[in-house]
Amino acid sequence: MLTVDYDRLGLEPGDRLLDLGCGAGRHAFEALRRGARVVAFDYDEGELKDVAGMTAAMASEGQVPAAGGSACVRGDATRLPYPDASFDRIIAAEVLEHIPADDAAIAELSRVLRPGGTMAVTVPAWLAERVCWALSDEYHAPAVPGGHVRIYRESGLRSQMRSAGLQPRGSHHAHGIHSPYWWLKCTVGPTNDDNPLVRAYHSVLVWDIAGTRPWSHLTRLADRVLSPVIGKSIVVYARKPHSTVTPSAVTARPTVTGEANAS
């Protein structure tokens, strides 16, 4: 299940791509299949271990083009361990809403993106997220450690990106059929996965993600119709202009552990 449109991002074989807050690796895997040199970056060691295992398996099965490669790196999004202009493309999918100092994270992303490079930032869309917060205090911080700490409006996110020296260049909503699922979960309890309605709806989402026919045709049609209205995520694409003056680099760097599975 991808949130970012790689064609709009402009990803090409051999591009250096940072997947910030890579999580389970969905965007990193697709970028690797397209021949990018991917850094999957996250704070969660367990998820990074799983991502490293998957990328190694992809390489051994011949799913990685010659131009591609990957590394898994643990670190702090507000103190990235890379020189200025290290990456051609950046994806930050569903991560900024977890970071208290999101301006610092956006500034770091701008710093490590090369002039002329592009970035895709995705966060929960305002309407879908507002309903979730209204339905359940268990859905967000402080009730959930590491949970969502804010709700974004697209205009505010664009303003933050401009302040970091980036030029927003377009946006779209995604995952329209996922919003009702999360509203249902928030109604019965975000951790109540045994609820019959939640389990039934989850099966529908699995059909959609797996492309199970004929149901996936219906779910994907529904998603295209619903996403502009109640999409769970908003994606904003931006470019770093050649003349930009990026925020000063953070001088201190975290201790970072990395695992490269291809080069």
Place the predicted regions along the sequence by residue:
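A short glycine-rich, Lys/Arg-flanked "PGG" loop and its adjoining helix->strand segment in the class I
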Residues: 103-118
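Conserved N-terminal segment of class I S-adenosyl-L-methionine
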Residues: 1-83, 89-93, 103-106, 149, ...
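Residues lining the SAM
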Residues: 93-96, 122
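Conserved catalytic loop of SAM-dependent methyltransferase domains
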Residues: 170-206, 232-233
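A short hydrophobic/small-residue beta-strand
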Residues: 38, 119-120
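Short alpha-helix
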Residues: 148-164
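Conserved class I S-adenosyl-L-methionine
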Residues: 120-148
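A structural helix-start
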Residues: 45, 99-103, 123, 127
